[in-house]
Amino acid sequence: MMVRPTGGLALTGKSTDEQINDYLKRWGIHQEFTYPFGKTQLWSLISRPGNLNDCHPFCKENEAFDWDGSNHIDRLEYLNGMTYIRQFLNWNEGEGYDLIIGEENGPQSYVVWQITELNDNQSSLSITVYPYLLANFNKALSFLPFVLYIRPKLRTYLKSVLRGFAYHAEHNQPVPRNYWGKHSWFS
C-alpha cells in the first residue's frame, strides 16, 4: 500500500526562498564526479523515478510517490533500514534539482544536484549537502565536529553515490550494494 508522506518545508510563515536561504547558512559538503557521457544521458540517469534502485550503493529501495512535471517526492530506504523522504523543491529540466531529505516529520537536510556539460561526450554532476546535523549549534563550536567527523563521512557517502551512476551507465545493471565499502551511517 502506498502512503503519501507528509512533511516538507516547515510552515514557518517564510517563503520557500527564505527557507532555502536558511539552509544555505549551514555548513555544506560538496562533491563532484565527471562522467564519460553527455549531459542528456546524465540527466536521464538522475531524473528517472526510482533511479536510486539502480545507482545508489546504499539504497535498499527507492519508491516514487509523485513523479510528474511539477511534483517529485520519493522515499529512500537505506540498507540499514533508515527511511528518508525526498521532497524536490526546484526541478530544472536537464540541469539539476534541489530537495530536502530526512525522516518523515523530522529534521531535514538541503541538497543541490547540478549537472555541468563539459563537452558532447563528457559531463559532471555535483552534489552539495547542507546537513541538519549541528544545524542548531553555534557555527564556531560546531566547526571541529563538522570538519573532523561529519564532512569526511558525507564525502565518502557522496563519492559512492556519484560513482554509482557511472557504474550503472557502464554495466547497464544495478550497482552492487556497498560496492565501494560499507558506510557506518547507511549500510
State the predicted function of each range.
Residues V175-S187:
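Charge-rich (especially acidic), low-complexity segments
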